[in-house]
Amino acid sequence: MDPQRQFCRNRACWAYGRRGEGHVVIHSRGERRYQCKRCRRTFVETAGTALYRLRTARDEVVVVLTLLAYGCPVQAVVAAFGLDERTVARWQARAGSQCQRVHDHLVQAGQVELGQVQADELRVRIVGGVLWLASALAVPSRLWLGGVVSATRDGALIRALLERVRACGPVRALLLCTDGLASYPAQALRVFRAPERTGRRGRPRLALPDGLLVAQAIKRYARRRLAAVERRVVRGTDAAVVAALATTQGAATAVVNTAYVERLNATFRARLAPLARRTRAGVHRAATLEAGMWLAGAAYNFCWPHRSLRRRERHDGRWIERTPAQAASLTDHPWSLHDLLTYPVPGATPKRRGRRPRWLLDATHAA
């Protein structure tokens, strides 16, 4: 039990959402409960997480969700553990909501160095229709920046994806590489605009950052085979794009490509049973696919070491495995799936009236 990781769950308490200040202590190790010294309320370790108030043993739930995150079909889990299919679906939905909250709290906090971002879409067959899953990847850290599920492959889908990319970090020096879909450059030149402050009265004009670069790799097919690849620079100069590619990919001969996000798509197809081609484990609703996407994506970011991110120690020559979240400086160690499912994410701080307590004023001044 780690009190420094917890915060008070009482929304009426002035210490709600504040962690690492010493006001949360262990109340009961047997029941795994904490207590806030400010409001004297106690709360269980799993409050507000995916494992809160589940009647099944916690270890069994984590094992089931681990199998789902590694691509095991729900029907196989039902047959192996003797569970009801609706129970497994409910656990997956709760895990997906928890992973989305963790992603919004840590990845979309605006602290990621993007450098180069690649985006692409997956066509997913579901029962009675088709869905599109759009994803974005930060190339230097291999960090998954989020995904969006939609019934149509249109500008609204791409706009929602690029808004998630913008929330992850600054776009002042960003290279966006995509395929030939026309919605990408059109929406990027809108989403990445920022107010240009001049000090004059009135609404400021929206302008694009000078360091924003947009490039496309357009593939031409003939007889269902790749015939040629046309590389087009939509915004910026060819020299600036080549320099950004060399910096973010570590190769002077790098060209405009979407290879990194396509490799991520292959990972998603392997780790999400509904994404497998010609599968019998198709989903019926978009919400089910979205829950699985967040579970697999968060596990990819925080739990699964990436081979290209490992580093060799200088003193003994050992390889140190790292996750994309470690490469992006969002955490200092690989998480277990239990850590991911029980990570406490504070909600929005409620508006309060009245005088603030003395300890809060002292903490504000100390910060």
Residue ranges of model-derived segments:
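Residue-level recognition of single "structural anchor" positions
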Residues: 1-367
